[in-house]
Amino acid sequence: MAPPPACRSPMSPPPPPLLLLLLSLALLGARARAEPAGSAVPAQSRPCVDCHAFEFMQRALQDLRKTACSLDARTETLLLQAERRALCACWPAGH
């Protein structure tokens, strides 16, 4: 009969692959805590970035307003043309 497998004592070091895995997880965790996501822009330059973004959005809004006015005017022109054609179709050709 074979002797029972030797149990590791609670204080014995873990096997090397497990040790490497734990070490790599600890290093990754420390790195993730050291570099929080979204902090690439220094605090001093954030107001400037925000100002540029605000100006860009204002220009985009002005462009959208111009486009909306242009589309509105074009729609009105097309509706008037359609009404004129409908009215002209109602009149007899001889008059």
Swiss-Prot record:
Function in brief: mRNA-binding protein which interacts with a range of target mRNAs including SERPINE1, ACTA2, CCN2 and COL4A1 and may promote extracellular matrix production. Binds to the 3'-UTR of SERPINE1 mRNA and stabilizes the mRNA, possibly by competing for binding with SERBP1 and preventing SERBP1-mediated mRNA degradation. Also binds to the 3'-UTR of ACTA2. Testis-derived lumicrine factor that triggers epididymal differentiation and sperm maturation.
Miscellaneous note of the record: Up-regulated in the kidneys and serum of patients with diabetic nephropathy and enhances renal fibrosis so may have promise as a biomarker of renal fibrosis and as a therapeutic agent for chronic kidney disease.
Pfam family, one: Neuropep_like
Gene Ontology cellular component terms for the protein in this record: extracellular space; perinuclear region of cytoplasm
Keywords associated with the record: Cytoplasm, RNA-binding, Secreted, Signal
Tissue occurrence: Detected in the brain (at protein level). Also expressed at low levels in the kidney, primarily in tubular epithelial cells.
Record-stated family: Belongs to the NICOL family.
Broad class of where this protein is predominantly found: secreted
InterPro entries recorded: NICOL
Domain of life where this protein originates: Eukaryota
Protein name: NELL2-interacting cell ontogeny regulator 1
